[in-house]
Amino acid sequence: MDKKDLFDALDDFSQTLLVTLAEVEAVKKNLKSVVEENIALHLENDKLRERLGEVEKETPTKTKKNRDNLRKLYYDGFHVCTDFYGQRRENDAECMFCDELLFRE
């Protein structure tokens, strides 16, 4: 191999390294963007989990109040089931649909 061939091979190798370096820089930039997005999503997820915990603590109280209101209406002689909602119960007869709604767990 003469000096010119050696120089050309070294020049080609240098160009290949520059192209590879550019590709590595592009991958590095893309990775940085993905990591930043991942961090942002983790923070948002943590905030949403905290908020969900707060909402779950509030929900049983609201549900209990709503169910108590429905029971009061039922004991006042009205249907609270979806089929007959608001209609008066004849002779205060039991309604299995209302009972299921009021006493389900």
Swiss-Prot record:
One GO term (biological process): DNA replication
Organism ancestry: Bacteria, Bacillati, Bacillota, Bacilli, Lactobacillales
Family according to the record: Belongs to the YabA family.
Keywords on record: Cytoplasm, DNA replication, DNA replication inhibitor, Metal-binding, Zinc
Function description: Involved in control of chromosome replication initiation. Inhibits the cooperative binding of DnaA to the oriC region, thus negatively regulating initiation of chromosome replication. Inhibits the ability of DnaA-ATP to form a helix on DNA; does not disassemble preformed DnaA-DNA helices. Decreases the residence time of DnaA on the chromosome at its binding sites (oriC, replication forks and promoter-binding sites). Tethers DnaA to the replication machinery via the DNA polymerase beta sliding clamp subunit (dnaN).
NCBIfam families reported for this sequence: PRK13169.1-1 (NF009640)
Organism of derivation: Streptococcus sanguinis (strain SK36)
Keyword Zinc: yes
Protein name: Replication initiation control protein YabA
